[in-house]
């Protein structure tokens, strides 16, 4: 009989195998090809299981190798550092909310259901959209679900995606949609402005097989798409769905997508009270305009208000026949317990800041990112390759290889931007980057360039 070296209470293994008609654990897993099985014990400890104290000591030794940065990271690419009020952390840490339980039973879940309804309402107001679900995994999965949703609605097989959309989101989308035979056709961007090439978009939208047109606002380069309303009109003319990806904080400065009649809106709530993390959760935003054809094809949970037999108002999950626990393979999505806790964090953050707070924060981010860009381009032969206005993120082109600059930044315990090419990098500046941090970044880069030019 199989005996696990550490886990107790496995005496019933043989009895369980017999009950399901299997002779051994090997027989249980015989569907897995032999060539990919690991036929050895995994070395999960040095010689023996470690005690709690030994584990803490080993982890502490590893943690000491971490570098403490002199300033918040200047790398973004869609995940940006922001200040998180302590009230956000405190409220979502309460035991009533800090659970993975899905509120199927409204009679015992009114608290979390109302909190999620408040999130949906706040996000709908911010986006000026009619229906918002109770969260997706992240921006990439929300985009993928939007493309799949468009395909279910109109049956078409091509989605137009700009080259200047976030490449990480596009990779997630490709993974999700490839099994459905949906084709991605990339639209060029103007190399001068950094915005979507409208002429190329109109040319590629001439096909009758275009299911959806996606555009990101601001785009991956941080640039505002000034022709966003025209792009929506192109989608309407071709009877394709418009999918808009938004940075929610940018809506403190620019028109919300609902104001120009976007069909579907996606994004990430990381900007609204969530930390940076290494492989941890994000929070996907998903919203649609009021059209039952769209609403009934939405993925994910939706919380609504109803009344009981005594006419008391209550909160419950609605339109559940869309979901996999009822429809199985015919469901709109297989997402179930999702990022409800993080949606609550977004709701708390939005409630704390309010409309004026969001506007003031967006203005502060705009000012600081423009200050950083101005200071960097004051260095000889350092330029911004794109001319259009930007928010939070921006591209800088250097006269020397960016790897050399990044090495110098790391020496000074600074995290530079995301390398885009040999000489260009995408930088992120938010409200947490003060003048001292930005000036340190600039002086370090200036020093790196000077050292190469004089060598």
Curated annotation (Swiss-Prot):
GO terms for molecular function: glycine dehydrogenase (decarboxylating) activity. CDD domains: GDC-P. Keywords: Oxidoreductase. It comes from the Archaea. The glycine cleavage system is composed of four proteins: P, T, L and H. In this organism, the P 'protein' is a heterodimer of two subunits. HAMAP family: GcvPA (MF_00712). This is Probable glycine dehydrogenase (decarboxylating) subunit 1.
């Amino acid at each position: 009989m199989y005996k696990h070296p550490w886990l107790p209470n496995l005496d019933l293994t043989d009895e369980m195998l017999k009950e399901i008609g299997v002779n051994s654990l090997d027989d249980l897993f015989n569907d897995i090809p032999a060539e990919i099985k690991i036929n050895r014990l995994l070395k999960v400890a040095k010689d023996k299981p470690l005690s709690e104290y030994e584990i803490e000591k080993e982890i502490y030794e590893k943690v000491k190798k971490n570098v403490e940065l002199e300033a918040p990271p200047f790398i973004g690419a869609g995940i940006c550092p922001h200040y998180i009020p302590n009230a956000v952390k405190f409220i979502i840490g309460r035991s009533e909310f800090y659970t993975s339980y899905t509120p199927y039973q409204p009679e015992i879940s009114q608290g979390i259901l109302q909190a999620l309804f408040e999130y949906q309402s706040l996000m709908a107001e911010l986006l000026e959209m009619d229906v918002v679900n109770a969260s997706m995994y992240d921006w990439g999965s929300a985009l993928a679900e939007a493309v799949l949703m468009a395909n279910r609605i109109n049956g078409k097989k091509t989605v137009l995606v700009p080259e200047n959309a976030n490449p990480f989101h596009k990779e997630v989308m490709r993974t999700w949609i490839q099994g459905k035979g949906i084709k991605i056709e990339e639209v060029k961007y103007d190399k001068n402005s950094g915005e979507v090439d409208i002429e190329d978009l109109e040319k590629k939208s001439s096909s009758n097989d275009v299911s959806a047109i996606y555009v990101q606002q601001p785009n991956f380069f941080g640039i505002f798409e000034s022709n966003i309303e025209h792009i929506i009109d192109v989608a309407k003319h071709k009877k394709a769905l418009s999918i808009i990806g938004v940075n929610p904080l940018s809506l403190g400065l620019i028109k919300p997508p609902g104001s120009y009649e976007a069909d579907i809106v996606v994004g990430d709530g990381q900007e609204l009270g969530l930390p940076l993390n290494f492989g941890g959760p994000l929070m996907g935003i998903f919203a649609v305009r009021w059209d039952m054809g769209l609403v009934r094809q939405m993925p994910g949970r939706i919380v609504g208000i109803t009344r009981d037999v005594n006419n008391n108002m209550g909160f419950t999950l609605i339109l559940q026949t869309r979901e996999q626990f009822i429809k199985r393979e015919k469901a709109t999505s297989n997402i179930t317990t999702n990022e409800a806790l993080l949606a609550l964090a977004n709701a708390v953050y939005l409630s704390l800041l309010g409309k004026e707070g969001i506007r003031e924060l967006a203005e502060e981010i705009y000012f600081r990112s423009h200050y950083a860009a101005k200071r960097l381009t004051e260095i000889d032969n350092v330029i911004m390759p794109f001319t259009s206005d930007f928010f939070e993120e921006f591209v800088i082109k250097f006269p020397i290889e960016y790897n050399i600059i990044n090495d110098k930044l790391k020496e000074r315990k600074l995290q530079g931007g995301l390398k885009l090419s040999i000489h260009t990098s995408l930088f992120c500046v938010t409200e947490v980057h003060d003048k001292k941090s930005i000036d340190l970044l600039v002086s370090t880069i200036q020093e790196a360039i000077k050292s190469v030019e004089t060598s």
